[in-house]
Amino acid sequence: MQVQPTKYVGLVADLMPNIRLMQASGHFLFRYVTGPILIRKVYSWWTLAMVLIQFFAILGNLATNADDVNELTANTITTLFFTHSVTKFIYFAVNSENFYRTLAIWNQTNTHPLFAESDARYHSIALAKMRKLLVLVMATTVLSVVAWVTITFFGESVKTVLDKATNETYTVDIPRLPIKSWYPWNAMSGPAYIFSFIYQIYFLLFSMVQSNLADVMFCSWLLLACEQLQHLKGIMRSLMELSASLDTYRPNSSQLFRAISAGSKSELIINEEKDPDVKDFDLSGIYSSKADWGAQFRAPSTLQTFDENGRNGNPNGLTRKQEMMVRSAIKYWVERHKHVVRLVSAIGDTYGPALLLHMLTSTIKLTLLAYQATKIDGVNVYGLTVIGYLCYALAQVFLFCIFGNRLIEESSSVMEAAYSCHWYDGSEEAKTFVQIVCQQCQKAMTISGAKFFTVSLDLFASVLGAVVTYFMVLVQLK
């Protein structure tokens, strides 16, 4: 048995409620725990066994009721619905190291004294959105389970059977359970029925929670990346004003070095009459390549100066410390943007295959649901069930498409923000910096499903359009 430390930082601390729920639902998430890991492993394997047993029972029902087309279609939809949960559960277990690696990417973020308040503000915005998303998705999941169980008690509990001798269909009674399943015991009544009913409620809740929690973690990663891009765009104008103080006269230039936005009027760097000793101003905390990127060689923390003989010659009378802080601001922006790019790349590598499996399953399921929707003849149990399946399946696709689309929008607008700021008033360093930013940010950041498609609202629109088109064709052929 092993006990992990209880102090967490960065993205792990932000997603701790999500992580705790994933551990409670049985995910193979053995880090970030405070108790014996052996118990966690036994619990996860037990949960996997319980989920697989019920899933095989659903497959057994599909195999034993393949004669009637309507029954086969309905059972196939149910099987595909829970395939999401099983695949994501197993995928997380097999690919857990990549999840750990992605969570650890944001544990070594550095900030800059001039932009600390902006960084903290956008971090708090991202954190609030993560929590709201988690609450909303979990509430929807619980309500879906309640609705699924409730609708079980309405309508007839029968299935259609084909008589091969006469080629006619007839109905037979089946256990009134939330999910049609094949069991080796008689679940029509008695203790076997009660056990089967409770077991299926457990399966419903855990399987849907497991799948949705993994999606919420993916969307939370994208939320953080989007808010960090907002942070970088927000400080672009201030960065230009700071850089302008290096070679252009600016009245009250000392105001640039006050933390007014943080509620303090104290100077971040004191204007000293004499040329200060710069040894006590260490910039190594602002994204040192060795600590943050694992590079073999560490870049020097002392930034270059263009003053002759190392003397302060700028028109605003800035001290060496202030000059170094201004130049380090550009370094901070570039390295933070690289950090976001690295995070987005890790997100795609970690969750891309799961998105591909999700879309493949959803495409087949939505096609079958469009066929089932043509048979709705009123407000009844059948109609509500089909509409419920359809809305839930589309909501799952829309969830990660909307956040993937926002990432594209935020990353593509970085170049516009760089061009729109007063770059022409900045120093030569700043002008070169803006030019490089515009070149590097021409291509938007995207999340792909294992390189097969890009996660965006265009993907959702194409899926929805295909379903509607197929539905209209079936209606005309009916």
UniProtKB/Swiss-Prot annotation:
Residues in compartment: Cytoplasmic: 1-41, 95-133, 210-338, 404-454
Residues annotated as transmembrane: 42-62, 74-94, 134-154, 189-209, 339-361, 383-403, 455-475
Entry GO terms, CC: membrane; plasma membrane
Domain of life: Eukaryota
Residues glycosylated per entry: 167
MF-aspect GO terms: coreceptor activity; odorant binding; olfactory receptor activity; taste receptor activity
Any single Pfam family the record assigns to this protein: 7tm_6
Topology term for the membrane: Multi-pass membrane protein
Gene Ontology process terms (BP): detection of chemical stimulus involved in sensory perception of smell; sensory perception of smell; sensory perception of taste; signal transduction
Note: The atypical heteromeric and topological design of the odorant receptors appears to be an insect-specific solution for odor recognition, making the OR/Orco complex an attractive target for the development of highly selective insect repellents to disrupt olfactory-mediated host-seeking behaviors of insect disease vectors. Odor-evoked OR currents are independent of known G-protein-coupled second messenger pathways. The homomeric Orco channel is thought to be a cyclic-nucleotide-gated ion channel that depolarizes the olfactory receptor neuron.
Subunit: Heterodimer with conventional odorant receptors (ORs). Complexes exist early in the endomembrane system in olfactory sensory neurons (OSNs), coupling these complexes to the conserved ciliary trafficking pathway.
Family: Belongs to the insect chemoreceptor superfamily. Heteromeric odorant receptor channel (TC 1.A.69) family. Orco subfamily.
Function of the protein: Odorant coreceptor which complexes with conventional odorant receptors (ORs) to form odorant-sensing units, providing sensitive and prolonged odorant signaling and calcium permeability. Orco is a universal and integral part of the functional odorant receptor, involved in the dendritic localization of other olfactory receptors. Can form functional ion channels in the absence of an odor-binding OR. Plays a key role in preferred attraction of females for humans over non-human hosts for blood feeding.
Protein name, per record: Odorant receptor coreceptor
Source organism: Anopheles gambiae (African malaria mosquito)
Phylogenetic lineage: Eukaryota, Metazoa, Ecdysozoa, Arthropoda, Hexapoda
